[in-house]
Every structure is written in structure tokens, then in C-alpha cells.
Amino acid sequence: IIENKKKLGKLKPTDFLVKTIVTTEVIAEIAKKNNVELRDCYTGFKWIAREIAISEGKQQYIGGGEESFGFLPYDKVRDKDAPASICLICEIAAWAKDQGKTLYDLLMQIYAEYGFSKEFTVNVVRPGKTGADEIKQMMADFRANPPQELGGSKVVTWKDYQSLETKHADGSVEKLDMPATSNVLQWFCTDGTKVSVRP
């Protein structure tokens, strides 16, 4: 989308992308390298739709998605839009074929330019009221004793969407600019790892 808008001279400084906070940071890298504003929002297409609504008439939305592989390519439908996404991927596949490439080739090209990404989800199930209490305690424990290292990589940034704070390893603290609080914790490591925890 961005590449073709650039080639056609249609990429504007007012264009923006949206991703949810738990979505791959490859999107952030794409936005950064192409000087496109990126907005992070909470999970759910209502939050992506909110970003479109607050920018209506001022900025142009050019795409957004979340980790569940949902994508919203246009601003007309304000929810996960599979039919439009299918049309868009068909258009991209046709363009790739004209270039003698496949969708897989394009994906590898994106990874080579912006960085590889691997995502996975771990579900911890604790049934009943006792389970709900255990999960609540897990979140409290993570807040009280945040990890300093994950998988052998040092944690350099910690985001708490309940207190709306970003803490850095150097001790500095910034406010998170979000429209509401959410019970989500994130850690960012030196090797590029991002871990998100939410009940």
C-alpha cells in the first residue's frame, strides 16, 4: 500500500496507519522507514475505528490491523473487513505476478527490509473464581516484580496500560497517551522481543 502510494506520488504527510498494541512491531518499522505516522491502540476494531473517526477530515487512514490477522484496508467499514482485505490481497497478488513474484516472495522482501517477526500466543487457563483470583494475583506480581530479563535478553522498556506509564531501564518514566486504561503489561527487550501479558 505504502510503496504504491509512494510510486504514484500519493503518499501524504497526513496519512496514517493503526495497529493494536499487541500486534507485530514490523508494522512500526515499516511506518518509521517510510515516514508514515503510526498509532497504537487497544485490541479490537472499535479502537481502530476510533482513530479513523477522530482524524476524519484532517488526516487519511491508509490501513490498520491486529494480531488476530484482521485487517481494515479502507475507512468506509469501521470493523474487521474481510471482503475488502481479500480484494486487496488479490490486487497485490496480481501485481506481484506481473513482477514475476509470489505473495511469499513479497513477504520475504518485507522481512528482509524491515525485520523478521515470529509471533505466538500462550494461554494460561485458571477456571472459576479461584482461577480469576490467581490471574489477578499474577498481574499484581508482574507489576510488583517486573522481569529484568526475558529469554536471556535484557528488558529495556516496560509499559503498564493500567497506570498508563512507560518505564525505561535508565529509570526514566513517560506517560502513555491512550484513551482509557487497560489491564495489559508489555516488556520490550534489547533483542527486539516484545512480550504482552493480559488477563
Tell me what each language-model feature is.
Residues 8-197:
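Phosphate-binding and adjacent anionic-ligand microenvironments
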Residues 1-3, 16:
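Hydrophobic, small-residue-rich alpha-helical packing segments that form membrane-like cores
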